[in-house]
Amino acid sequence: MQEVLAAVLDTVQQTPWLREFDGALRYVFPLLALVILIRCAKSLLMFRREPEVWAWLAGPTGDHIPVMHWENLIGRGRGCDVTLDYPTISRTHAVLTRYDDGSWTVSDVGSKGGVCVNGEETAMSVVAFGDEISLGGVGFTLVPITKEQERIQAAVRTRPDGEVHPAVTLLFLTLFQILACLQLMLGCEETGAIAGAFGALIAMQWLLFGFYRMRRRSGFDVETIAFFLSTVGFAVICSDNPAALKKEIVAMAGGIALFLALCWTLRDLERAKKLRYAVSAFGILLLMANVLFGVEKFGAKNWMQLGPVSFQPSEIVKICFIFAGASTLQRLMTKRNHILFIAYSAAICGCLALMNDFGTAIIFFVTFLVTAFMRSGDFATLGLAVAGTGFAGVLVLRFKPYAMRRFAVWRHVWENALTTGYSQTRAMMCIASGGLFGLGAGKGWLKYVAASDTDLVFAFVAEEWGLLLAVLMVAAVAVLAAFVVRSVPLGRSSFYAIGAASAATILVVQTILNVFGTVDLLPLTGVTFPFVSNGGSSLLCVWGLLAFIKAADTRQNASFAVKLPDRGEDSE
């Protein structure tokens, strides 16, 4: 079959009009990518910010204060979810929590005036609708929203398939994939493998979309961006190393399975909280095993070999790290929780330093800063963390020659174009030679340079597919990050908000390090571009990260990571 297909393509390639068509495709790909990205961005970024009201607090003056999250910090401070301007109420007084089954609890978080439920003082108590909650001597009653209010609230909320239908966007992506497959088959030798890989990719995305529709989920924009970036990644592998396509298909299928498993886990907050400690412990044990039994490649001991399979544990640990950092509001108010997270982060970064994996250590550290700020809001603590890490960084550069060499060539690659700056100088030349629209699939030169499909993948895409498409790859990650920024304030739980922000931070920092490292604006750290760089461990991880972003998506019927009601209802 492979020989027949190759013979047909050889005959077709002799046709003059087909060569012209092949050249014209270079201008079509950026246009299709732009249409896909604009449609996804419009759906993800233009929705109305619609807070959900879950209950009311009836005050002593008869006013009704909305309770708009599952976890609500109550106090006199302006940063509280429910602000009560009474002198006897502390700045941070209590946490009012809703659970999956509709029950409520109230917890004292070290207030001066105390918390009472129906006249009895308590540190934590179950609260039912109609119960009186006394905060610093001021009484409030928990009141449910009416069925009519619930119906109106559901009716006015944005549906992700309103103005921009995800099926149409997916059709544009499928057209992009078919045309990319055709061009790759015309420009590369492994035609059968290329056709099979793109066929599997298209099948997986439509099967996932069909599964969503069966489950009454209409939001598919985040997943469409992931499939778009994965398509570009498949195109890179087809051109550079077609033998790796089978591995990438398996990794993609595994990543989607992990994504769905994490979505199922996160849709039940109590289940996610129970798994948190086990997953966190697994992450640190996995890195410790990597330190002891890891295999060194390209100067970093960040690989493990299990028979014929090699993988990077640090990629899997990113998901474990998010589980460790995410926490409910009630636990965030305790010092013990903060201390444990700082110790966990230090242990992770320490293991990465021992493995010489400083690129991944940077990702974890920046994610730690974002997570720590969301947990505490304390800039002084962050400043101390940055200062301490800066001192540790100086020691690392002093005693780790490998890391020092990476920094020594930074901003001096053209002076070392034949030695330590070889890869980056060739990458920048290939970006320039590709121009805006690229040389065409399989016609680039960068594939002959080491790590061109991983560390230098931005330049690889720019050379063969054009700088416009390479920039749109970066824009796709930016759209995901912007969506998280808009979604997090509306998150039902701080667990979901912190998880989504941490996942987006990892994706953004990886993208920045990969792109800026390629063009010598930052040191080349060997960090992959999310979804695009060749690597099964990386692809598995980034699909897992998407689950945390989907868990913070509270648009109407948008996310598989958010429970729907009974079959007879249409809203969440």
Language model regions located:
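Forkhead-associated
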Residues: 66-139
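Transmembrane alpha-helices of multi-pass inner-membrane enzymes
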Residues: 120, 125, 522-563
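Hydrophobic alpha-helical transmembrane segments of multi-pass inner membrane proteins, especially
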Residues: 191-420, 459-520, 544-548, 563-572
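N-terminal membrane topogenic signal
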Residues: 157-172, 218
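Long extracytoplasmic/lumenal interhelical loops at the membrane interface
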Residues: 435-468
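Short, highly charged, low-complexity non-transmembrane loops/tails of multi-pass membrane proteins
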Residues: 54-60, 559-572
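C-terminal boundary/linker segments immediately following FHA domains
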Residues: 11-15, 116-161
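Intrinsically disordered, low-complexity acidic Ser/Thr-rich regulatory segments
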Residues: 1-86, 100, 147-156
